[in-house]
Amino acid sequence: MKFGKRLLPLLLTLSMTASLLPAAALAAEADAGEKHITILGTSDMHGNIWGFSYEDNSETANNGMARLYTYIQQTRSENPNTILIDAGDDIQGTIMTDDLYNKTPEDPHPVITAMNYMGYDAMTLGNHEFNWGIPTMQTILGQAEFPVLATNVTDAAGELVTGAGWTIVEKDGVKVAIIGVVTPDVPIWDGGKEGIDGATFEAANVAVGKAIDEIGDQADVIVVSAHMGMYAEFDEEGGSDSAQKILDDNPEIDVLQVAHNHVVVNETQGTTVIGGVRNGGRDIARFDLTLDADNNIVDATVEVVDMTDVAPSQEIRDIPLVAEAHQKTIDYINGGGSGEDGEGGVALGSTTAKFQPENEISGIPAGRVMDTAVMDLINKIQLENSGADVSAAALFKDTSDLPAGDINYGNIFDIYKFDNTLYRVTVTGAELKAYMEWSAECYNQWKEGDINISFDPEYPDYLYDMFAGVDYEIDLSQPKGQRIKNVMFKGEPLQDDQTLTLAVNNYRYSSALKSEG
């Protein structure tokens, strides 16, 4: 549904009555019967219910589902015609989820329990929902009291893995269709896990088009909740994993929610409002629609609201399972990851100094611009355990650190939170340099007059790999693809046809290396 056909009846009505009514009456006539629908969109909450960093054992100041709920309730009090949707990556990402509750999927899950309490109208699958295989995902999400959507994923029997690809929510007589679609790149990262190799992940743009056809005239408003970024991640030619391609092929979409990349998106293309948020519950996307008496959209706006100044909801924290899970996680960390009673306070080791230096320039993380002890540690471990010539690894966030003092499980999770598998693969010098160029794309090109290094917001922290076993330079004055200079291996220039072995985790191998051939 688009503005063009909605505005025409309204404009004709106004033009016919303009000569007959005074200005005040005209305004009242125009406002009569108007409806206001608010759609709130969250995504990539990654298990952060409380607003608490288990790695640092401290409250956070700007994130968490509890903060989101405060804003959600405030919005509902202002406009009861509010719809709440989510674009996935919610049941993964903290010690609470990954090390405790996702390993017992048949037990009540704190994230889904909190989402039920918050009153979600729909959720779209994210790629991280698949991390434990499809049966585990289905068991956990089966606890949801709201539809879970993925219009482009079917199992080996041809059935939608969540049972639904879209749903319709009615508010004030306005029927809002919500279509959920996840990046089709899931098999790149989670292939081999139960149920995934037999599943079909259809191109997002194609699947959304089919869903819109199915919906037909059942809805007044079309919302697409897409767990992917605006631009293609792997399929640059076909755009099967691109929200932009979804919109290009389906311009009748009224609201487009994007996710996955953990970056703020706030824009309008034509008459489609587009919004996306960062990770961990740091923001919420707000879409406000004004419709006339015939349910035609006459105005639409999007805003991404930062949660920094929002207080966490005690209601969410007081949900019995949430409170229990929070304390259970703290006990698990203090017990060295054992989770057993009586084993609290067990240290896994100790350090005499912090491994991450202070930022030399405000706003520019040291972990992104210099060699650090924490990165050296990760690469050293990978080299020693693989016997490879070169190691590549990333910090999952630029500030990941091992602080001075005792080391507990939370500290380890902070610097390496995923259960990846370490691979040793054979590469040529040319292939390694191409990989290094890909990593260096996270920087913006330096231009004359720039006073600081800056980063491309489309590249999250975890996509910047650093390399050990080779010496190299990055020339930021050069465009992407031409930045890696003077690569030295064992004191000699690395030749393109030279063969060496590389230690890299399975995630990066599948996404940045194998997928490139």
Where is each model-derived feature located?
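C-terminal segment of classical bacterial N-terminal signal peptides
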Residues: 8, 17-26
